[in-house]
Amino acid sequence: MTLLTKQIISKFEKHPIHSQDEKGRDAEVLVKYFNPCGTGTWLITEAEREGDDWRLFGYCHIHEWEWGYLMLSELASLRLPFGLTIERDIYTARKYVRDFLPQDA
């Protein structure tokens, strides 16, 4: 699956790193990436191009939720069981970080 489309690039360019500081769970989610065969969800809220790559920032869950940085190339290089790779959620209608979290979080 293509992790980066022209539409996503356009969103990234409008939301550079630190553009949603202080919004916390009210930050807009630009794209959701996920592991299709296990834990791993990345709610990307900000991004900046670095050479041929993108530095991403968002609310991520592997063992617990935490804010953090990663490179798009890191996600793209992950090789999962059965030949699977990290995928982009193309069906979600949720817009903010809070919309992806349990009610009591």
PLM segments and residue spans:
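Catalytic phosphate/metal-binding cores of nucleic-acid and nucleotide-processing enzymes, i.e., regions
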Residues: 1-105
